[in-house]
Amino acid sequence: MRSLVEVINENLIYEVREKVYSKDVSGVTEFCNDVLSGDNWKVNKDLSVDIDKTSGSGYDMSFVFPNNVTKIPDFIKFKGRDVSIALTTSGPYNKNIEEFNLNFDGTLSTVTVNNVPKLKEITINDVQIESIFIDKCAKLETIDLSGCEVTDSACARKNKSLKTYKAPDLGKKVNTYNIDNPGYTDELYIMDGVRYKRDEKGKLVKI
């Protein structure tokens, strides 16, 4: 005969309820307190969030999504100049985020997304990005950078579930471009500013 503990464990359902933020200054402030690791931000009356450059060597905007937050509310827009961003697995954080839809007004310097286990979609709106790196996100299916302009580097590698990739515009001085994933590999490849095309066998041919 099974014990009472075994019966309870069999029928116990663990549910993480998605946190809902109100569409007002207090809701956006609460989101930033929950999700941004630093304090270099300010919420405006129009619900936009100003991000200041930090004086240290770290990222200006590090996301640390708790388990009950899986995306950025669509009414939040971030603003800043030459802002660096990180979304990586960090301790107990970023384990359940599924969508990273970044609405940004200004310019981005470095964007790093690495090893986020449940992330399925990355969308960044029309913005200039110096360098972006998206690596080792096992469930990532879609990257949408259409409308963005990359000026130095764009790399997306070892994202084994990637199916859809919408490329950014590439500036004339792009130094590195490497979109190489099991499900999707871009035929264009740039190394040290030299452009190549991958032929039908994957061999690089200088353009």
Give, region by region, the residue ranges found by the protein language model:
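N-terminal capping/linker segments that flank leucine-rich repeat
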Residues: 1-106, 115-117, 169-207
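Canonical position 11/12 of the leucine-rich repeat
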Residues: 69, 82-84, 96-97, 106-108, ...
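Ankyrin-repeat and related helical/solenoid repeat scaffolds used for protein-protein interactions
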Residues: 133-173
